[in-house]
Amino acid sequence: MTGVSIKFDNPEAYDQWMGVLTKIVGDRFLTWLQPNTSKHWIDIGCGNGASTEQILEKCSPSVIDALDPSEDQIKFAKSRKLTKLANFSIGDAEALTALDEKYDYAVMALVLFFLPNPERGVSEMVRVCRSGGQVAAYVWDILGCGLPTNPTLKVLEARGVPFSIPPSSEISTVNALRTVFEKSGAKLVETTAFRAERIYASYEDYWDLSFKSIFVSPAVKNLDLKLIEEIKTEVKENLNIDQPGRVKAKAHANAVKGTVP
């Protein structure tokens, strides 16, 4: 369902509701890449800098350039402790300003499904990577109900409340990721999936953070308070809540990597 725009204008809130799960998936993604140290990286669509920080922490790059179209996100990214070593800029994933064959690794973390033209984005990744370099990406499996906020979105959909998902959500399947990478000219293309869980201390904790998400917040912020409470109650009924009242939230992402010929 669409009808509400997705905006990245609150990086602090994004980090609160998404940070734990993206840290888990991001670490597994970088381990899967098995990168060499002291290499040149570009983090395309770096958002609030979480992925850039993970690359710096786990991969010891000699150079890392990071770009995002949101000034708010870039400002927040620069405030992270480790990201002082990164080169941040405002940029378009489908029209990179980098020279051809500049990097050893080009990555997109939770980005491809937000691009109007994912094929163009992947082609740009391949263009800026050296021969033998690696291009890679991961996305929440939206069509496979992999979004962390999926329990809430299901209730909104059932009630006819408009909300938006990324515009190119069809790219989130394993087959679609493999196809777009192979069409870009990448070789030795591989795919995998990562699952992650987060434990919330209570349902109130879960709801408060979900309410801040870029998918839920725009859809419910202007609703009648009575309707919001009804949605809140219905979501709770569909969650895995243990005896102490903790909520176990699950998400899963699909990933792809390939080598530049």
Residue positions per predicted region:
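Conserved Class I S-adenosyl-L-methionine
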Residues: 3, 22, 48-50, 169-261
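Conserved alpha-helix/loop element of class I SAM-dependent methyltransferases that forms part
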Residues: 20-39, 54
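Conserved catalytic/acceptor-binding region of the Class I
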Residues: 119-120, 126, 130-201, 217-220
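Class I SAM-dependent methyltransferase Rossmann-like catalytic core
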Residues: 5-20
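A structural alpha-helix within SAM-dependent methyltransferase catalytic domains
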Residues: 30, 53-56, 122-126, 153
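A short SAM/SAH-binding and catalytic strip from SAM-dependent methyltransferases
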Residues: 105-118, 141
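Class I SAM-dependent methyltransferase SAM/SAH-binding core
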Residues: 40-96, 120
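A short acidic, Gly/Pro-enriched loop at the edge of an enzyme's catalytic core
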Residues: 94-106
